[in-house]
């Protein structure tokens, strides 16, 4: 069985161009994502799925220096880009990672991978808790069958979304996909407040850099943020964007 992690990233975000190369905790954000994935067991290959545009050359060079595989394809059609990764790597299971999600709860993510290995008769795998939702810190896992069905449901009605968001078509057709859901009750602490952990804006990058500086280390668990936010509140932490006037 071959398991890959597929990082989808490009440098032409209108909200925060080249954000994957911006420093988070003293390292490029994409490097933190790669290091997170290397903490997980059973991942055989990490792949960057990016575009053929010259604007992504720096991103590709950094990822190559980290020793991960590269696939370059369409900027706007993720069915083609992700399909190209499937052809190149021939995986049994894919862990899709968004390039703007630099934080992972390692225990929760590992539980999803372990479930995908232990329960092979499903298209997709995820984790849920009756308490807080922190989707950007968790992962999903998809078998090849998930992508086959996902591309098909998008092709059946491409008007529901753009090809860069074909997952919308998947969400509109949940009955077409079999799914195993890991019980995250004992993994996701009930005291966690639901919040956004992805980085789409410079302001968010500045905020999380301040949090990491306050912690003194890079977080790998949701509980790290609980402690950090509690400590920052107790010392009367105040912060504003450095670019604010």
Q: What name fits each language-model region?
A:
Residues 29-46, 59-61, 65-66:
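A short, N-terminal amphipathic alpha-helix
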Residues 104-195, 206, 210, 226-245:
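Conserved core of the sugar-phosphate nucleotidyltransferase
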Residues 52-117:
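Short phosphate-binding loop-to-helix
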Residues 1-17:
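N-terminal nucleotide-binding beta1-loop-alpha1 segment
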Residues 9, 50-52:
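Short beta-strand/turn micro-motifs composed of small residues
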Residues 201:
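Short, conserved phosphate/pyrophosphate- and ester-handling motifs at nucleotide-, phospho-/glycolipid
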């Amino acid at each position: 069985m071959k398991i890959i992690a597929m990082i989808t990233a490009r440098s032409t975000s209108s909200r925060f161009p080249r954000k994957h190369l911006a420093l988070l905790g003293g390292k490029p954000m994409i490097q933190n994502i790669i290091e997170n994935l290397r903490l997980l067991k059973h991942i055989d290959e990490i792949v960057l799925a990016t575009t053929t545009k010259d604007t992504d050359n720096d991103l590709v060079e950094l990822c190559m220096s980290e020793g991960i595989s590269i696939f370059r394809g369409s900027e706007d059609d993720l069915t083609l880009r992700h399909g190209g990764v499937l052809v190149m790597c021939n995986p049994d299971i894919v862990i899709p990672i968004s390039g703007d999600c630099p934080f992972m709860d390692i225990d929760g993510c590992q539980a999803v991978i372990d479930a995908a290995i232990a329960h092979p008769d499903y298209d997709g795998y995820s984790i849920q808790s009756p308490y807080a939702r922190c989707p950007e810190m968790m992962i999903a896992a998809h078998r090849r069958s998930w992508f086959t069905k996902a591309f098909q449901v998008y092709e059946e009605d491409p008007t529901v979304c753009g090809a860069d968001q074909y997952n919308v078509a998947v969400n509109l057709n949940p009955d077409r996909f079999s799914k195993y859901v890991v019980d995250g009750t004992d993994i996701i602490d009930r005291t966690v407040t639901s919040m956004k952990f992805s980085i789409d804006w410079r302001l968010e990058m500045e905020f999380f850099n301040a949090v990491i500086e306050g912690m003194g280390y890079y977080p790998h668990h949701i509980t790290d943020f609980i402690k950090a936010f509690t400590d920052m509140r107790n010392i009367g932490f105040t912060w504003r964007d450095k670019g604010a006037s």
